[in-house]
């Protein structure tokens, strides 16, 4: 499967790095998209190569989506093309994994009303206002959406996401 990660500078390092390597370990092709090709830098200084600019992404060419957290989603959600990618993939029932502030992109896409999920507690009100049945749990699976809260939830988050990809 081809998995797309949407992110930008100031991502939460482990929330991008862990799923990237975990999914590659499972044999999936994993590509990172951001505002432009090159390199993005995490909150703690880790750098990641960007394979595609948002404008180059054709969501039909990907089977699943990962939305890491940190400060990056605040900026990514302002990019019309990135939000369009997330909306299309989520609405088509493709597996989507979000953690921490990652759901901010899905909130902007308007796809979460009536869904059950979790996030970083700091955006709980935003999630509820977007129509999410917010739960304080390490991982929540609702159909094609797997959500988690914080880096401590990474193993449970990816364990459930990998199950969806099989």
From Swiss-Prot:
<keyword id="KW-0963">Cytoplasm</keyword>
<comment type="subunit">
    <text>Homohexamer formed by a dimer of trimers that assemble into a hollow ring structure.</text>
</comment>
<feature type="domain" description="PfpI endopeptidase">
    <location>
        <begin position="1"/>
        <end position="166"/>
    </location>
</feature>
<dbReference type="InterPro" id="IPR053435">
    <property type="entry name" value="Peptidase_C56_Deglycase"/>
</dbReference>
<feature type="active site">
    <location>
        <position position="101"/>
    </location>
</feature>
<protein>
    <recommendedName>
        <fullName>Deglycase PYRAB04690</fullName>
        <ecNumber>3.5.1.124</ecNumber>
        <ecNumber>3.4.22.-</ecNumber>
    </recommendedName>
</protein>
<dbReference type="GO" id="GO:0005737">
    <property type="term" value="C:cytoplasm"/>
</dbReference>
<keyword id="KW-0645">Protease</keyword>
<dbReference type="GO" id="GO:0008233">
    <property type="term" value="F:peptidase activity"/>
</dbReference>
<dbReference type="InterPro" id="IPR029062">
    <property type="entry name" value="Class_I_gatase-like"/>
</dbReference>
<dbReference type="Pfam" id="PF01965">
    <property type="entry name" value="DJ-1_PfpI"/>
</dbReference>
<dbReference type="InterPro" id="IPR002818">
    <property type="entry name" value="DJ-1/PfpI"/>
</dbReference>
<keyword id="KW-0378">Hydrolase</keyword>
<comment type="similarity">
    <text>Belongs to the peptidase C56 family.</text>
</comment>
<dbReference type="GO" id="GO:0036524">
    <property type="term" value="F:protein deglycase activity"/>
</dbReference>
<dbReference type="GO" id="GO:0006508">
    <property type="term" value="P:proteolysis"/>
</dbReference>
<comment type="function">
    <text>Deglycase that catalyzes the deglycation of the Maillard adducts formed between amino groups of proteins and reactive carbonyl groups of glyoxals. Thus, functions as a protein deglycase that repairs methylglyoxal- and glyoxal-glycated proteins, and releases repaired proteins and lactate or glycolate, respectively. Deglycates cysteine, arginine and lysine residues in proteins, and thus reactivates these proteins by reversing glycation by glyoxals.</text>
</comment>
<dbReference type="InterPro" id="IPR006286">
    <property type="entry name" value="C56_PfpI-like"/>
</dbReference>
